[in-house]
């Protein structure tokens, strides 16, 4: 009888060797230096697209340079895990062995009828309009935002959600967005590495299913002048392997002190590394949307609301050095013990603050 002449071994799963010279890398590699490696990322689920097994992987050069976006993310997640776990073990909970950043992203998009899309060379070539006349009616009345989802779009959304569930992407919401023919979906939060992989996968699925419904999908941040563009807002936090959200206040002063510890360090990190945060989203397309045209501006700031601002003001009044017994008591009674357990709606959201 016949035998298979090809099989997929464990070694092939763990490591492969693609060409590392043709990949855009900003000059890290010379074009004649071709050897590179992909390595399996077992922390993100493999999945099947059609009949193809897709394996989340990192991509490095023969000499160790990072050639992808996943490797820096994994390094950052590991650094946060080590630092946060040390703090938890030393001061708050010795049972914590891992701290994972969690991420819930939003995906905004425009749908354009395929025939109309193909009649616009600027849309086809750049993903955005380069010239045109403002419409007689835009988003002034909010009638699209608060209106019903069109039937054709709803059919697209339903098929998209079914495909997402097949691939383990936990989408939960669908709705119209502000601009005409702009829409949004969002998932449940996940571990940050998995969430990023799922968002990349989702955009590929969205474009493929849009084609089936005779739509073309636009992900450009500012495809049309005069109406809102598409943002990708991120809801971010830190979670322990014991089930705690470290950026959520607790029921007692000790838990609130734990929250304040991570809260002030997050603000310090935003202050110290604002340039890196800004650089991470400083694409040409995003700069069309930010600052001059839409909130938020290019200046990195953090809006925390009047309640938490008051808490930090009280903390600043404590004298330098060791706390006196009176200060310890006053701090516990006046600040740490009084943060409400749930901060839901304690403060508005400030659209002029990129980190809010």
Q: Positions of the model-derived regions?
A:
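Glycine-rich, acidic/polar active-site loops that bind/position phosphate-bearing ligands
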Residues: 1-219, 224-356
């Amino acid at each position: 009888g016949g035998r298979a002449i090809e099989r997929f071994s464990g070694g092939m799963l763990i490591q492969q060797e693609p060409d590392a010279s043709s990949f855009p890398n900003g000059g890290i590699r010379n074009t004649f230096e071709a050897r590179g490696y992909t390595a399996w990322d077992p922390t993100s689920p493999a999945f099947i697209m059609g009949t193809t097994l897709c394996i989340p992987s990192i991509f490095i050069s023969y000499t160790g340079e990072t050639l992808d976006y996943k490797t820096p993310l994994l390094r950052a997640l590991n650094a946060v895990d080590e630092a946060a776990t040390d703090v938890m073990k030393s001061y708050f909970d010795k049972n914590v062995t891992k701290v994972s950043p969690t991420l819930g992203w939003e995906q905004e998009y425009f749908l354009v009828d395929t025939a109309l899309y193909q009649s616009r060379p600027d849309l086809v070539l750049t993903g955005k309009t380069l010239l045109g006349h403002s419409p007689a009616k835009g988003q002034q009345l909010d009638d699209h935002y608060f209106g019903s989802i069109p039937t054709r779009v709803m059919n697209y959304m339903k098929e998209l959600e079914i495909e997402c569930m097949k691939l383990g992407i936990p989408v939960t919401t669908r709705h119209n967005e502000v601009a005409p023919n702009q829409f949004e979906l969002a998932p449940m939060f996940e571990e940050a590495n998995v969430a990023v992989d799922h968002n990349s996968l989702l955009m590929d699925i969205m474009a493929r299913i849009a084609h089936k419904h005779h739509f073309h999908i636009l992900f450009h941040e500012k495809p049309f002048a005069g109406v809102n563009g598409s943002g990708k807002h991120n809801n971010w936090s830190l979670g322990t392997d014991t089930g705690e959200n470290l950026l959520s206040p607790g029921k007692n002063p000790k838990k609130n002190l734990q929250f304040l510890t991570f809260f002030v360090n997050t603000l310090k990190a935003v202050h110290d590394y604002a340039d890196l945060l800004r650089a991470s989203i400083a694409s040409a397309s995003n700069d069309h949307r930010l600052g001059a045209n839409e909130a938020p501006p290019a200046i990195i700031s953090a809006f925390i609301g009047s309640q938490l601002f008051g808490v930090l003001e009280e903390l600043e009044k404590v004298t330098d050095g060791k706390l006196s017994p009176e200060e310890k008591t006053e701090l516990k009674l006046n600040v740490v013990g009084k943060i409400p357990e749930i901060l839901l709606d304690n403060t508005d959201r400030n659209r002029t603050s990129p980190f809010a």
